[in-house]
């Protein structure tokens, strides 16, 4: 009986050591949604870098739901991951989730969207304010300084929507552009179509549209095509579908991010943190206008 107890104890100890060893090389990436090509590309970039650096990477989808996001983080603290990369569903709501990770001494890095009130070791993102300004200036250059424009906004409460809108309004307020309407379509293609249909009916003289992501831009494109109007549409993100539409002359332009690089840099910065190295609080990722 004593020998059996010893064997059981040894087995339990072996299991504990195995779990601990596995946790040491495990990171996680929590994405706001995987129902958007931009974030799928971000995931791919993170996975490639994690494999290169020898980490296991857990991927979780928050399905654009802050409560799901919170439960994802709670699950990861139980699983003992060593670092968490998070693309927040909401810049304010994510604070509670990040605090849970902080209490477990798990470093958190934000990707693309920031967190308003949380202890985050680094934020990896494009400068969305500059991107919004780039879109506004492109419209002025191609359509005219007095162009009548509409803006499709992303999910309210996200830093990306707030900052892209801020940048675009900087361009509008510093020019003779006339903003006819600005309404949210939640970064969603179908909502972009539906909202744009209503805005076209209310604003038949619109000349250009700035959509805060390519998914909304592509939805708006369908509405414009159905109306038969000649309206320039500028998107944001530089997704595969967005760039393809630009190359076909359907979208005027897209302000291109590099989501694969955002994901890759997130893992790279987390690796440095785990090795005790210092990382910048903000790691910028370059933007560029893609036009035909």
What are these regions (language model features)?
Residues 3-4, 21-292:
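A residue-level marker of the well-folded mature domains of exported/periplasmic proteins
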């Amino acid at each position: 009986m004593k020998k059996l107890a010893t064997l059981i104890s040894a087995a339990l100890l072996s299991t504990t050591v195995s779990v601990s060893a596995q946790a040491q090389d495990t990171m996680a990436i929590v994405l706001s949604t995987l129902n958007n090509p931009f974030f799928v590309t971000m995931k791919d970039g993170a996975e490639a870098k994690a494999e290169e650096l020898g980490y296991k990477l857990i991927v979780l989808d928050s399905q654009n739901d802050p409560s799901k996001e919170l439960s994802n983080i709670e699950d990861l603290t139980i699983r003992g991951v060593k670092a968490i990369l998070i693309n927040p569903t909401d810049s304010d709501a994510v604070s509670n989730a990040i605090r849970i990770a902080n209490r477990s001494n798990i470093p958190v890095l934000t990707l693309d969207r920031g967190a308003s009130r949380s202890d985050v070791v680094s934020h990896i993102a494009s400068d969305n304010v500059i991107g919004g300004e780039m879109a506004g200036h492109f419209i002025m250059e191609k359509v005219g300084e007095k162009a009548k424009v509409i803006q499709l906004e992303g999910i309210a409460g996200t830093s990306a929507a707030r900052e892209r809108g801020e940048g675009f309004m900087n361009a509008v307020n510093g020019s003779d552009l006339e903003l006819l309407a600005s309404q949210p379509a939640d970064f969603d293609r179908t909502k972009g179509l539906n909202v744009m249909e209503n805005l076209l009916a209310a604003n038949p003289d619109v000349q250009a549209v700035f959509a805060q992501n390519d998914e909304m831009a592509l939805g708006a494109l369908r509405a414009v095509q159905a109306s038969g109007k000649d309206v320039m549409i500028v998107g944001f993100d530089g997704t595969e579908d967005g760039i393809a539409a630009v190359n076909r002359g359907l979208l005027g332009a897209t302000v291109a991010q590099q989501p694969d690089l955002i994901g890759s840099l997130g893992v790279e910065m987390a690796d440095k943190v785990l090795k005790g190295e210092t990382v910048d609080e903000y790691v910028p990722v370059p933007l560029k206008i893609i036009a035909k």
